[in-house]
Amino acid sequence: MCIRDRPNTEYLVYAYGVDPITIERLTPISKKTLTTLAPQTIDTKFDIQIVSTEGLNIDVLVKANDYDGHFVAKIYGSVDAADTDATVLEKISESWIDNVQIYGWMGYTAEMILSQYTFQQSREIQETLEPNSKYYIYAFAVDDEALRCSDIVFIPITTNDTSIQH
């Protein structure tokens, strides 16, 4: 699979010959439907520990359990009031797929994406959150092609004017 392709997606590929001067089609159109492969999923767990909170500052430690591959761990904050856990997890997954696709268009290889945007064994996250908002601290495994290959483990948290609730 090309890093620019979306996993488990159907594509219609077509080809035909054209005259380079008149731009007229010279051959019949050939069409073929192809489906990209879905990544093989693995069953891995992540420990997400909120180490400390002070006001709107949060310190999180994410550890991979019995998994030595690459993973993504972040805090997602683009949560709408009507979003359910399922819709937020879909947004997180789609956001990663979109980013991998964009990096591919920019010439990044899977290895470059893995080395710059993923982690192994553990990751510490320190952020200052916005007041009166909902966030998801999350982690998921990625394969050698930088595609998500595990369920997303998450903890939802909210903030009020001055502090974090979890």
Sequence positions of predicted segments:
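Surface-exposed loops/turns
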Residues: 7-8, 131-132
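Extracellular fibronectin type III
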Residues: 20-41, 143-163
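Structural beta-strand segments of beta-rich domains
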Residues: 56-60
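Extracellular acidic, Ser/Thr/Pro-rich low-complexity tracts
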Residues: 19, 64-68, 143
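Aromatic sugar-binding surface patches on proteins
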Residues: 102-124
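Solvent-exposed loop/turn segments flanking beta-strands in beta-repeat/beta-sandwich domains
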Residues: 62-100
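Extracellular recognition modules
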Residues: 12-18, 136-142
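Conserved small/polar residues in nucleotide/adenosyl-binding loops
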Residues: 1-6
